[in-house]
């Protein structure tokens, strides 16, 4: 299972706020999560998505398209993928691994 760190950057918006665009992306992600294809977590600066690599690419394409559906003509998307294949990793397991090292 892979984990993607994705930031969608709508360019040319009428206001500096992008929360409406973020909400649109979250709605798309909720649909994929309801289908059992991904898990995701919104953070203040990006969205983390966990799933099979092929599903991640499909999801990323769908959320990249969302601002265009609102009439924008330019979108920049930053993607970082952690695809570890020697063992199963999840969003939670990565945090648990760090927390183990923090225990006295």
Curated annotation (Swiss-Prot):
* SUPFAM superfamilies reported in the protein's UniProt record: MTH1187/YkoF-like
* InterPro entries named in the record: MTH1187/YkoF-like (IPR029756), Thiamine_BP (IPR002767), UPF0045_domain (IPR051614)
Residue span of the signal peptide, if any? none
Give the matching PANTHER family: UPF0045 PROTEIN ECM15
User: To which protein family does this belong?
Assistant: Belongs to the UPF0045 family.
What protein is this chain from? UPF0045 protein YqgV
In which organism is this protein found?
Answer: Bacillus subtilis (strain 168)
């Amino acid at each position: 299972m892979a984990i993607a760190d994705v930031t969608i950057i709508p360019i040319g918006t009428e206001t500096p706020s992008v929360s409406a665009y973020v909400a649109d992306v979250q709605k798309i992600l909720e649909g994929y999560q309801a289908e059992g294809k991904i898990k995701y977590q919104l953070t203040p600066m990006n969205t983390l998505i966990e799933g099979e690599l092929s599903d991640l690419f499909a999801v990323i394409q769908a959320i990249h398209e969302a601002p265009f559906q609102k009439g924008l003509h330019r979108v920049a998307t930053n993607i970082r993928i952690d695809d570890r294949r020697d063992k199963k990793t999840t969003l939670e397991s990565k945090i648990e691994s760090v927390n183990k090292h923090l225990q006295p």
